[in-house]
Amino acid sequence: MNRNFVVLILVLIVIALLFYPVIFKNRETARNLDSKGLSVDTLQERPNDKELRTDKIRSSRRNAITNAAEIIEPAVVSVNVIKTKMVKRRRGFFFGFYDEVPYNIQGIGSGVIFSKDGFIITNAHVVEGATEIKVILTDTRQFDAKVIGIDKSHDISVLKINGNNLPYAKFGDSDDLIIGEWAIALGNPYGFLIKDSKPSVSVGVISALNRDFAENNDGKIYRHMVQTDAAINSGNSGGPLVNIYGEIIGINTFIFSESGGNIGIGFAIPINTVKKSARELIEYGKIRQIWFGFKVQELNQLIASHLKLKSLDGVLVNYIQRKSPAALTGLKEGDIVVEINGNTIKDTRDAELAVSDISVGDKIRIGILRDGKPLEIVLNAVENR
C-alpha cells in the first residue's frame, strides 16, 4: 500500500515537471498581454482594427495621378456656346418660296483657366461663330465669357471672364515629354446637362510626339501634336492634358475615330505652341500674319532635269516680291529650298508646316541650293500690313 502510494507520488511529480514550462509560458503571455491592455479575448479583430485597415487601403489608393487630378480640377471649366445658323424655311405650304431664318444651336466644350485674371484656353472650333459663351466653373459659378482672340490655323482661342478668387493651372513644358509617361485628360463635357459641375478624368500615356497633319478643309494646321491613349471626346475638346504634377502639357483637340468614340488615338496641341499663340492673342487680339515675300512650287522631273538636280526633294522658289523680306535677304527665283529652321523640306506640305509655327519677330533660317551649291539665308519675319 505504501509502495503504491510512493509510486503514485512519483508519477504526479514527473507529470508536473513535464507540463510546468507550458503553464508558466502561458501565464507569462497572459501577464504580457495584460500589461499592454490586452487579453486573450481581444486578440480577435476589433472594429478599430478594421477601420485602421480601411484607412491604410484608402491612403494606398492615393497616387501621383489622383494628386494631379486634384491640382488641375478646379481650373477646368465647361464652355457652353450658342451659335446662330441661318436655315431655310418654307414660306407657304403650297408655294416653293423659302425664307432664311436664324436658328440657335447649342454647343459644349471644355477649357482651362491659366491666369488669376481669368484668361481661358480652349479650341477655336469650340467658340468659332458663337453669339453667346457661358463658362461654368467646378464650384458652380457661371460667367459670361468674351473672346479675346482666335488662332484659327492652330485651333486655339483665348477667352476672358471677370471674377474673384479664380483658380488657375500652371503650364508645363511640352518639349520635355517622354513617350510612355502618364498623361491625364480632363474636360467638363456636360455643361448644363447635369447638375454636377466636376470635370471628367481619363488616364493614359504619351503614345507619340511630334505628329504632323496637313492643312485641313477649315484651314487648320496641326503640328508637333501630342498623341495619347487617354480618352478624348468632343466634350472634353479644349480641356487640358496634364502630367503627373498637374501641369498643362497640351490642349485636347481631336481623335481618330470613325464612330466618334474614343479608340485610344487622341491628339493634343502641345502647350508650348499654345503659350506662343496665347501671348500673341492677349497682346494683339489676333495672330499677326507674316510677310515672307516669296512663293514656292513642287519640283517635278522636268524642273529637276533642267536644273540638274539629283532628286526631287525640296521646293522651287518661283516668285520674289520686290522690296520684300525675301528680296532684301538675297533669296532668288530658281533657288531650291531644302531646309527651314532645321526642318527638312521635301515638298510644299513640309514648307507649310515648317513656317506654321513662326511668329512676327522670329528669324527664319532657310537652307537653299543655288547652282548646286548649298547656302543659308536668314530672313526676318515681319508683319504683313
Segments from the language model and where they lie:
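Gly/Ser-rich catalytic serine loop of serine hydrolases
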Residues: 103-111, 169-173, 226-242, 318-328
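C-terminal recognition in membrane/secretory proteostasis and scaffolding
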Residues: 1-42, 67, 146, 178, ...
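Gly/Ser-enriched beta-turn/beta-hairpin loop segments
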Residues: 87-104, 148-154, 194-199, 209-226, ...
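Conserved positions in beta-strands of structured domains
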Residues: 112-114, 125-127, 146-149, 207, ...
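Active-site loop architecture of trypsin-fold serine endopeptidases
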Residues: 4, 49, 53, 130-133, ...
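Glycine-biased strand-turn-strand hairpin within the trypsin-fold
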Residues: 28-120, 128-134, 141-142, 214-227, ...
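Conserved active-site neighborhood of the chymotrypsin/trypsin-like protease fold
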Residues: 106-108, 113-195, 313, 345-346, ...
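Short, surface-exposed secondary-structure boundary micro-motifs
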Residues: 82, 125, 188-189, 254, ...
